[in-house]
C-alpha cells in the first residue's frame, strides 16, 4: 500500500514538475521596451523579430538572415598578399607590433559586407490609453511564444507573437475584451530603399539592400552604396484579418486601419533574391516575389491554432532535448520581473 502511494506521488511529480519548469522559462517584464536591448526576440531560423510591447504605439522590427550588402566576388582581391608575409614576420621579430599591425592589412581582402535591417511594423492604437494597469510582457523560452498584456478600463488586452519555422511566417494576434474593440493603424517602414502599396488588406513592400558597404568604424561620408540594378532585393507582405470588425485600406499612405474588432490576426512573410554566395542576386536571383506570395497564401489558409500548434511542436522537438537545472529559487524571487 505504501509503495502504491509512493508510485502515485512520483507519477504526479512527473506531470507537475514540467509545468513548474515551464513557468520558470519566461523572461518577464512589467513595462514596455524602450531600447533594442530591452526588446524580446523571436525567430524561425530565417526571419527574426524584436518585440517592444508598446501600449500607445507598438513596434515589431524584422530582419532576414539573407538580407546582406554585397555581391559575389569575381576575382581574388589580394593576389599579391603572400609577399607581405615576410615583412610582417620581420616586424614581429623586431617587436614592432604597430608596424606589423599596419602591414597585415596588405594580406586582407575587401572589408566584409554587412547585415541590414528589413523594416518595422508599427501598430498605432488610436484609442485613449488612460486607465491602463497590470502591464506584463514575456517571452516563454519553453515554447518560443511571446505576449504583451494589460488591463484597460478593467478589460484585458493581449498581443501574442510567434515565429513559425514550419510555415516560414511570423504571426501576431491582438485580442481585446472591450466591446468597442480595437482601433489601430498598421504601417510598415524600412530604412532601405523601398516602395509600398496596400490592397486587399495586405501591405506589400519591395526594396533592396546596398550592393556594397563599409564597416561602421570606416571614415566615409557614404558607408552604403545603393543601386536598384544591384544588390539583394526583397519583398515583404503583411496580411491583416479582422475577425469581427472592419479593415480599411488607406491607399494614400499604404496603411491599414482596423476598427471595432475584438480579435485581429496579422501574418508577416518575407523572401529575398539571395540564391547562393556565388550567384548574382539580380541576374541569377531567386524569384522572391512568387515565393513570398505562395508562402503567405499557405499561411493564411490555416487557422491561428493550427499555425501555433505546428510551431510549438516543431520548436519543442529541438528545445526539449536538453534541460538545464540551476537549482531552487525562492517563490518570491521567482515572481519578480527578469530585470529586477
List PLM regions with ranges.
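N-terminal secretory signal peptides that target proteins for export/translocation
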Residues: 1-4
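Sec-dependent N-terminal signal peptides
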Residues: 6-17
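Sec/Tat signal peptide C-region and signal peptidase I cleavage site
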Residues: 18-22
Amino acid at each position: 500500500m505504501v509503495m502504491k502511494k509512493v508510485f502515485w506521488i512520483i507519477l504526479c511529480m512527473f506531470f507537475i514538475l514540467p509545468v513548474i519548469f515551464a513557468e520558470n522559462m519566461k523572461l518577464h517584464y512589467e513595462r514596455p521596451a524602450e531600447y533594442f536591448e530591452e526588446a524580446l526576440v523571436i525567430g524561425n531560423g530565417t526571419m527574426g523579430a524584436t518585440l517592444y510591447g508598446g501600449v500607445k504605439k507598438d513596434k515589431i522590427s524584422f530582419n532576414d538572415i539573407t538580407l546582406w550588402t554585397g555581391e559575389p566576388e569575381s576575382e581574388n582581391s589580394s593576389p599579391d598578399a603572400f609577399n607581405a608575409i615576410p615583412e610582417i614576420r620581420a616586424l614581429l621579430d623586431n617587436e614592432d607590433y604597430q608596424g606589423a599591425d599596419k602591414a597585415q592589412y596588405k594580406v586582407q581582402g575587401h572589408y566584409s559586407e554587412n547585415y541590414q535591417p528589413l523594416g518595422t511594423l508599427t501598430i498605432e492604437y488610436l484609442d485613449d490609453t488612460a486607465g491602463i494597469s497590470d502591464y506584463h510582457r514575456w517571452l516563454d523560452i519553453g515554447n518560443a511564444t511571446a505576449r504583451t498584456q494589460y488591463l484597460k478600463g478593467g478589460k484585458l488586452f493581449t498581443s501574442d507573437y510567434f515565429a513559425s519555422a514550419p510555415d516560414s511566417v511570423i504571426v501576431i494576434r491582438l485580442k481585446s475584451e472591450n466591446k468597442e474593440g480595437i482601433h489601430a493603424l498598421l504601417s510598415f517602414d524600412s530604412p532601405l530603399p523601398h516602395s509600398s502599396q496596400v490592397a486587399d488588406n495586405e501591405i506589400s513592400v519591395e526594396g533592396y539592400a546596398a550592393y556594397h558597404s563599409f564597416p561602421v568604424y570606416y571614415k566615409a561620408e557614404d558607408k552604403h552604396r545603393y543601386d536598384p540594378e544591384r544588390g539583394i532585393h526583397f519583398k515583404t507582405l503583411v496580411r491583416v484579418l479582422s475577425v469581427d470588425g472592419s479593415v480599411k485600406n488607406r491607399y494614400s499612405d499604404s496603411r491599414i486601419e482596423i476598427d471595432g474588432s475584438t480579435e485581429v490576426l496579422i501574418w508577416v512573410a518575407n523572401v529575398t533574391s539571395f540564391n547562393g554566395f556565388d550567384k548574382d542576386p539580380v541576374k541569377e536571383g531567386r524569384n522572391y516575389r512568387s515565393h513570398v506570395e505562395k508562402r503567405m497564401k499557405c499561411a493564411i489558409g490555416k487557422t491561428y491554432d493550427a499555425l501555433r500548434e505546428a510551431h510549438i511542436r516543431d520548436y519543442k522537438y529541438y528545445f526539449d532535448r536538453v534541460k538545464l537545472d540551476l537549482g531552487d529559487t525562492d517563490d518570491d524571487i521567482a515572481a519578480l520581473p527578469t530585470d529586477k
